[in-house]
Amino acid sequence: MCDEANPAKPWQLPDVVYGNGIPALCLLHQEIEQFYNYIRSTPTEFCLRAGAVRRIEDVVLSIWPSASVDLFGSFRTGLNLPDSDIDLVVYYKFWNPRLLHELQNELVSQGVTDPDTVTVLDKASVPVVKFTDLISRIRFDVTFNSVASGVQAADLIKDFIRHFPELPKLVMVLKQFLSLHGFNEVYNSGGVSSYALTLMVISFLQQHARSNRRLSEHSKLALLLIQFLDYYGRKFDFFKYGISVLGQGGCVEKARLRSTLGENNWQSVLCIEDPVTPTNDIGRSSYGVLGVMQGFGAAFVKLSKLVDSDSSKIVGPILANIVEVPQSIINYRAWVHYNFQHLLTPELPCADSLVQPSPTGSTSPSASASASEDERSGGPATIGFGRCDDPPQNIDIVADLANLKMN
């Protein structure tokens, strides 16, 4: 059913499948699968990113030969959108704020970036050099020494991905949703970071797993997405509870987090306990979370009405009612594939191998890179975690929807 996608919008199912009586939840489930397969990095995009990372590492080592560079964030976990930035950390024992400007100058002098795209935030809580790589047009954030926990967090996320195969598919849809509504930037709009969103999804999946509810493999992603939007958009009390993934995960009364997060941190509206550094509240800067909550609630209403409608009257994509891919992203990906397919190699590296090992000594498997249809003639390329498909279970889709309404 997904073999012949819409050529103009490859993340959508072919028009012919709509209006044929296929249950809406089945359609939405397949649309989420299709969207995930489309939006994640292709081998060409992965190689372009890998090359950009190595260029930055070469610049760093040309300045400080004894330094080391490590990768963290969404590119390390495989949860990056096509336009996501890349997060790097430089470990150097002779730290000084001047290093930020030294790196800035060297990146410009070696032709890696344009001076107009470089920003040095030396007064930020985590000082960072932000710039755009000229060749790939990929944005970078480079920090120094202070985010070893970021590498550990990325590896922890990969462990959760192995445990919850639905996690990356839900996260990618939700990340695109936040991006479209301008809620993905913490620094500029008080939105929800990629890490915070991922922890929210993990906590939700942990609670769902404890409920022992078995969902049909043909509609699982649709039900989980709708339930997530309902939970955080209409039911979760952000003022009373914090979010945790430690142990069995779930919601924790904020008052109970006071001892670990401190007198001030635990009072943020979006309170998320950092599983790597429990004294850190991941959501403390997300002052726009109430807007995010309203967006989730509105998306729930849209999707729930559609999946509850007569399936014979569904004439187009369901997911498109809350998620779209801007033409600028489509154009960028076309540009990448036209100009950089020569970067493909028989065996793609994993993200962890792109840079020197960090002081944490992390060696866990790396992120996934996937192939677009035109690159899969030799079979899909998989890096790190693979897909985990459980055997189909004989659960009635209608019963799944009925249970959703009851909850």
Curated annotation (Swiss-Prot):
Keywords, ordered alphabetically: Magnesium, Metal-binding
Residues that bind Mg(2+): 85, 87
GO biological process: nuclear polyadenylation-dependent ncRNA catabolic process; polyadenylation-dependent ncRNA catabolic process; RNA 3'-end processing
Bias (Low complexity): 357-371
Domain PAP-associated: 221-280
GO cellular component, one term: TRAMP complex
Region Disordered, residue ranges: 354-390
Keyword Secreted among record annotations: no
GO molecular function: metal ion binding; poly(A) RNA polymerase activity
Record note on disruption phenotype: No visible phenotype. Flies are viable and fertile.
InterPro entries reported in the protein's UniProt record: MTPAP-like_central, NT_sf, PAP_assoc, Trf4-like
Protein name: Inactive non-canonical poly(A) RNA polymerase protein Trf4-2
Species whose genome carries this gene: Drosophila melanogaster (Fruit fly)
